[in-house]
């Protein structure tokens, strides 16, 4: 009995020793982390994370004459974004932020068009290219890795504004849809006519023609609600065509314009 009791006491002592060691290491790690944050703060560095959602669209500017009317628009599902960033403050007002962001940019639209460049996939899997007059439904679901580099200006203790360029890399892509209630003239507006009426539709998919690298401008504002929590809004405006240079089915350039809204945490 004494031997068993002694073994139990030894186990308890070992457990207590392990717990004390873990607690000590955790406390040391926390202290080092706090010291690192304090050092960064004293040297003008600030780190943060953001999480939000995006709403907007991919559109030509201005709307070309081929697009006669926008019949409907929807965000195209939940489009989330996650970002980590570092800010260097040069003085009490001015600073610069570099970030890395994963962002979804979606939309779904329906439009009435006339002589709109189109390459459709017919029922037997073949392609027909020409000019479409009628209804067009477009679905865009793209995911990007984005690197913004923006200048910051503190308007007050709680408010700051930012502006600067960004570059992005396309990770997942989808630009597709279908045409309905209209006709296709091939190869041009004086060519043979193919009609689609009632439930007859034809699909298209331009996903493989999307450009991998894009760039643009970002303009934003941020309000610090609490010591570490803030609310932000960033508008991103693409400045180069989303399609590759050799893609000529659609005769005009299209640009991604999205508003990203969410919450951030400053360490």
What is each residue range found by the language model?
Residues 45-47, 78-84, 145-149, 215-219, ...:
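Hydrophobic, lipid-facing positions within transmembrane beta-strands of outer-membrane proteins
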Residues 223-228, 255-267:
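Outer-membrane beta-barrel "beta-signal"
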Residues 49-55, 98-104, 163-169, 233-237, ...:
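Transmembrane beta-barrel strands of outer-membrane/channel proteins
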Residues 88-92, 153-157, 225-227, 267:
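Outer-membrane beta-barrel strand-turn architecture
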Residues 29-87:
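Short glycine/proline- and aromatic-enriched beta-strand/turn motifs that initiate or cap beta-hairpins
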Residues 28-48, 92-93, 115, 175, ...:
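Outer-membrane beta-barrel biogenesis signature
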């Amino acid at each position: 009995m004494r031997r068993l009791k002694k073994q139990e006491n030894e186990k308890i002592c070992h457990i207590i020793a392990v717990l004390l060691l873990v607690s000590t290491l955790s406390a040391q790690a926390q202290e080092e982390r706090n010291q690192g944050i304090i050092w960064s703060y004293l040297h003008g560095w600030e780190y943060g994370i953001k999480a939000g959602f995006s709403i907007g669209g991919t559109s030509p500017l201005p709307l070309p004459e081929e697009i006669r009317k926008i019949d409907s628009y929807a965000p195209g599902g939940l489009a989330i974004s996650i970002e980590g960033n570092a800010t260097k403050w040069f003085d009490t007002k001015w600073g610069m932020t570099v970030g890395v962001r994963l962002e979804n940019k979606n939309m779904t639209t329906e439009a009435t068009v006339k002589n709109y460049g189109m390459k459709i996939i017919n029922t037997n899997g073949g392609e027909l290219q020409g000019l479409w007059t009628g209804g067009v439904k477009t679905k865009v679901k793209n995911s990007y890795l984005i690197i913004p580099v923006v200048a910051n200006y503190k308007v007050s203790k709680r408010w700051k504004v930012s502006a600067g360029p960004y570059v992005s890399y396309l990770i997942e892509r989808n630009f597709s849809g279908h045409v309905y209630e209209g006709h296709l003239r091939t190869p041009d507006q004086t060519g043979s006519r193919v009609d689609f009426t009632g439930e007859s539709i034809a699909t298209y998919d331009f996903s493989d023609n999307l450009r991998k690298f894009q760039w643009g401008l970002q303009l934003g504002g941020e309000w610090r609600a609490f010591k570490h929590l803030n609310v932000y809004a960033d508008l991103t405006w693409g400045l180069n065509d989303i399609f590759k240079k050799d893609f000529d089915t659609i005769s005009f350039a299209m640009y991604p314009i999205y508003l990203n809204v969410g919450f951030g945490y400053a360490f």
